[in-house]
């Protein structure tokens, strides 16, 4: 089970596009939900004063959102459902932004109604769906599986709109629909539940042609239980629900097209149009006068007309786009507002407060209802500009005072920690990503802004549209090469270390929209080739070694959507937007075939090496673990603009078989349009970060001996007796250890091929070091070249982003002093990725969306007011005994700092695991907890929770216990129960971090008991029971446990780093039989500083 990834969004000055296609207000009247053409959902906070503020973006769809609806009884579970054009359906928890369920069906829904009859059906209810398919689908609201369907006995057709009628008079529920042909159909709901559950066919009981087309809305009047409002695009009608006889018809005037309507009171109708106007009508004389049908077939004449009382309109805007998406809400709670709301393609939301008794003017003319509130995403960014700065805003000085560089393309190189940004003016900026993030986020950023070396490459005369780092795709290519393309169809090959232009390719085509590389098995002249897709639908193939253009295919009539390779015959297969296929012979440059229709589909399906618009290939060479973001992106093969493009992660394609390894820190550039990058996401992999800081990675050790060390201890004793272990006197037993040396992970040797090139940067230059051979005993392993200082800096930045700065100023000072972490400049936009396809990001100004936080914690990095309550509960559950971690009371500052950081991250890792697990899994560890049983269940579904619990218990007391202590079990249950309370992962992590940091500082005697937030004063007497006991160290040897499959470092001096180095220069390694190294203390009688693995595996060898 994969843990969630923590994210920090570095927005630019411009908000991402959000073209609203669907809108609704939740039943609690606190949240507005909008779906967009770009595929994402936005949650907007709605206050009791009808003030709007954007709060969160939810990513889960890869196509335009078509409709939104309630998915549960909202008072019990705050769930909604969204549907997209490509058949995707997602169930969301709007409280925490989590996607609860997702499915893709071969149906395009245009309307969804939730139905649940508590006394007649079990489960969570049904989603009744209609759209571009016949009749009505019934989908299970929990699993999103198709249950059954309502069928038509005559004239089955697509359904335009529908509504559920709950009649209190006859105690029966009915489903009313109107087809595209204008036929009204009625199905019984209540009496059909058993038939549906038994998979029996259910047909309509009534039907009637309404003699109008393009039905937009059908609504039942709950006030009279007699009126039925049906809105068509050119007229709206009122029918008698008893016999469906026509009572009233109102035809559109001034060329307006109606878009919907609602019955807001008895005999009072609200109608709105596609251009954002609305009208309130009063049906005079009760409005119920039978229509006259002339015998000669002339136009229907009504005896009376409805009286127009009020109207609303939107502000005139030259850039105003249609159609508007509108809706109506009648609040059932105080203050009992009646609200008309609308969403625009421009992303604007507008609210009107409808009076309880609308009246016209004294002269009888309609009264204009003013706009109550209006808001856009850009308003959030303008109001909270400190939170909406991009990752390279501090480079604005490079532009000679002309403002911040406008980023149009971006690429992150994890192996170098380099962020490459192509700008609108043609320049390319290269900087250290982690340092750039620090300068953007932290208060001490002024100290960092001058330190990170940056480079500016100048060679383009137009905007840079695409970037490619070939070495990230194939390790056999030169590490210094980088490709960039611009609007003027110029592709430049750079040496990023020397800043030289190696070659320029002038394609004489349209803008270079994508740079791709051929797969590993497809080589021409012994080398892989580069594919350039241009805006004029042409494709060019470049040979980097020969610095030549091999092919320029120009005959495509439609935008290129797919590139495939045929390695046997050297064919390039191009798929276009019209589903046609072009087959090019690369050597001769001739067009071999052009196919369309079924033949084209067969050809595309026969090729394996595809480069698709929506593939699920990895985003970056070191982010295989970041699957949640990878699969959400539209992949690197984004060949030109899509009709409904979503936000896409920009990166290089990964089509090689190179060995990759995960990274604790990653930067993902995210596109908002095909021509520019809107913002960047910082991704923190907490699990990988803990793996690197703890010398024994959690996921790669034998579970039977990894935490309690029984088998390792026996092996160590046996090996000592045989005198096959290497002993080394510790020269630092009583001396201080640096934080970097303490956190230095066990590293894997570089094993790409037969050799590797190590390099480090000094003063903006590159030092090429000699190649070194690797022992033939070593098995090829993924390159795991990790800079220890970079890892500890990543950990500090991660803690800085999550700490609730400002809640307790004394605690802030102590964290800066004793943990050596910097304070945030202000609240940041946090995010999270919980599963493979969905993630969420907070928007600038999210901290002011909770009314309870505005007064007390304005400008505080507190995720929600709930964090303080959760922190109280966590502190109260902690054991009452107080213990100082071994060695912390007399350790040097750097060692104590590093110990504390690793301890905090380990705790947060545990919380991150538990909060996403069901309660029954977490409680299962309470009965019996022996390591043998874990070994037998290594491949079981509950392995993660058992592993984490053993880790938790070992960190707590360092003893081999057969079961989890009651106090620990209480903590496990508490954290697991938060899931059922709609607690977000970020809330849980921040609450635990606040409690742990505060308790840790108190246990060290650094702060008094009463120096804490007011909300935590009740639990001030609850001290933290420290994890690590004091052990006897009379004749102690430090045992360092490493992976069974990894080579081990020989005793060498600690890794030395340059100030600007990107990777540690690790020494040669040798394979040892037991893969363990024992170090003897220089002063056996004295306690000495031990690495964290000695605390995780407390082994004492006599």
UniProtKB/Swiss-Prot annotation:
<keyword id="KW-0853">WD repeat</keyword>
<dbReference type="InterPro" id="IPR015943">
    <property type="entry name" value="WD40/YVTN_repeat-like_dom_sf"/>
</dbReference>
<feature type="modified residue" description="Phosphoserine">
    <location>
        <position position="1081"/>
    </location>
</feature>
<feature type="repeat" description="WD 2">
    <location>
        <begin position="60"/>
        <end position="102"/>
    </location>
</feature>
<dbReference type="Pfam" id="PF00400">
    <property type="entry name" value="WD40"/>
</dbReference>
<dbReference type="GO" id="GO:0031214">
    <property type="term" value="P:biomineral tissue development"/>
</dbReference>
<keyword id="KW-0597">Phosphoprotein</keyword>
<keyword id="KW-0091">Biomineralization</keyword>
<protein>
    <recommendedName>
        <fullName>WD repeat-containing protein 72</fullName>
    </recommendedName>
</protein>
<dbReference type="InterPro" id="IPR019775">
    <property type="entry name" value="WD40_repeat_CS"/>
</dbReference>
<feature type="repeat" description="WD 8">
    <location>
        <begin position="555"/>
        <end position="594"/>
    </location>
</feature>
<dbReference type="GO" id="GO:0072659">
    <property type="term" value="P:protein localization to plasma membrane"/>
</dbReference>
<dbReference type="InterPro" id="IPR049916">
    <property type="entry name" value="WDR7/72"/>
</dbReference>
<feature type="modified residue" description="Phosphoserine">
    <location>
        <position position="1083"/>
    </location>
</feature>
<dbReference type="InterPro" id="IPR036322">
    <property type="entry name" value="WD40_repeat_dom_sf"/>
</dbReference>
<feature type="repeat" description="WD 3">
    <location>
        <begin position="160"/>
        <end position="197"/>
    </location>
</feature>
<feature type="repeat" description="WD 4">
    <location>
        <begin position="318"/>
        <end position="362"/>
    </location>
</feature>
<feature type="repeat" description="WD 5">
    <location>
        <begin position="402"/>
        <end position="441"/>
    </location>
</feature>
<comment type="function">
    <text>Plays a major role in formation of tooth enamel. Specifically required during the maturation phase of amelogenesis for normal formation of the enamel matrix and clearance of enamel proteins. May be involved in localization of the calcium transporter SLC24A4 to the ameloblast cell membrane.</text>
</comment>
<dbReference type="GO" id="GO:0031410">
    <property type="term" value="C:cytoplasmic vesicle"/>
</dbReference>
<dbReference type="GO" id="GO:0005737">
    <property type="term" value="C:cytoplasm"/>
</dbReference>
<dbReference type="Pfam" id="PF23123">
    <property type="entry name" value="WDR72_alpha-sol"/>
</dbReference>
<feature type="repeat" description="WD 7">
    <location>
        <begin position="507"/>
        <end position="552"/>
    </location>
</feature>
<keyword id="KW-0968">Cytoplasmic vesicle</keyword>
<feature type="repeat" description="WD 6">
    <location>
        <begin position="459"/>
        <end position="504"/>
    </location>
</feature>
<feature type="repeat" description="WD 1">
    <location>
        <begin position="15"/>
        <end position="54"/>
    </location>
</feature>
<keyword id="KW-0677">Repeat</keyword>
<keyword id="KW-0986">Amelogenesis imperfecta</keyword>
<dbReference type="InterPro" id="IPR001680">
    <property type="entry name" value="WD40_rpt"/>
</dbReference>
